[in-house]
Design a protein with these regions (language model features):
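Structured beta-strand/loop patches that form or line metal/cofactor-binding pockets in enzymes
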Residues: 1-29, 33
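Metal- or metallocofactor-binding catalytic centers and their adjacent structured scaffolds
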Residues: 21-98
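Metal-dependent enolase-superfamily TIM-barrel catalytic cores that perform enediolate-based chemistry
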Residues: 113-226
Length: 290
């Protein structure tokens, strides 16, 4: 089997899908996308297409290494997101050629049920609570929310109390049986994040995501040492090399590699194995395609 061409389809507001065509009339599907940067990722895919034409898509690891290592500048959000979608399409073709689901090729199913969470927001606390109650009624046992306003390097007492009151009200509405996580989106400085987490601790956050920018491992370690709340990060990190320091230093409790950004299916599986060796949890990230 040989790759004959790559075809990209963009769908607003932020989806992009790859079709990898072959000489056997099999098509592999992938999702090479980076939020807000779809045209740039598309150009990266077209650049990689030149290498892929005429190659056997079933040599997934070989092509991944060739595409990643072949350039002087490696990695980063654009190139690795393009490579992620290409790698997904190659896995899809391998599974289709063997008439075997990809999860079987990866070692088979290990569980029958997986806990998922719903992201919930609202312009007002009342709206947030109403939506959260509805999701809990649907059966979601974990919800995640965030603080919408822009955050200065240091915020005043009123800001901290407002955010805390909103989360406390939500906790009282859904009760202790529903876990509540918070996404800081890396908007908080390490100093402000430490203060904010301390204020939220009495309301038992399930985890806090991106308490500061993900590349600041020193700050994450300091935050980890200052709280009992589990910390999470990883959606803006790329490849096993990007996660290595974070894992070795056990800077967070939960890693969130994104299947469309971190390098694809096989690369995320490697990251998960590295995390397992350090007793860290993995929650694969992907809020993209349908």
């Amino acid at each position: 089997m040989k790759i004959t061409r790559l075809e990209l389809t963009m769908i607003r507001p932020r989806w992009m899908f790859l079709q990898m065509h072959t000489d056997r009339d099999l098509i592999g599907y992938g999702e090479p996308i980076l939020e807000g940067q779809a045209p740039a990722v598309a150009e990266a895919v077209k650049m990689m297409e030149e290498y892929l034409i005429g190659k056997d898509p079933r040599r997934i690891e070989h092509h991944w290494q060739a595409l990643y290592r072949g350039g002087f500048y490696r990695g980063g959000p654009i190139l690795t997101s393009a490579l992620s979608g290409i790698e997904q399409a190659m896995w899809d073709l391998l599974g289709k050629s063997l008439e075997t689901p990809v999860y079987q090729l990866l070692g088979g199913a290990v569980r029958e049920r997986v806990k998922v969470y719903a992201h919930v927001g609202g312009d007002t606390t009342e709206e947030l609570c109403t939506r959260s109650k509805a999701l809990a009624t649907q059966g979601f046992s974990v919800l995640k929310t965030s603080f919408a306003p822009p955050v200065a390097y240091l915020e005043n007492q009123a800001f901290v109390e407002s955010c805390t009151e909103r989360f406390a009200t939500l906790r009282n509405v859904v009760g202790p049986e529903v876990d509540l996580a918070i996404d800081f989106h890396g908007r908080f400085s390490p100093a402000m994040s430490k203060r904010m987490i301390r204020a939220l601790e009495p309301y038992y956050p399930f985890f806090i995501e991106e308490p500061c920018l993900p590349g600041n491992t020193d700050a994450l370690v300091e935050l980890r040492n200052s709280t009992t709340v589990p910390l999470a990060t990883g959606e803006r990190l790329f490849t096993k090399w990007g996660f290595r320091d974070l894992i070795q230093r056990q800077a967070v409790a939960i890693l969130q590699p994104d299947l469309c950004h971190a390098g694809g299916i096989g690369e995320v599986k490697k990251i998960a194995a590295m995390a397992e060796a350090c007793d860290l949890a993995v929650a694969p990230h992907n809020p993209l395609g349908p």
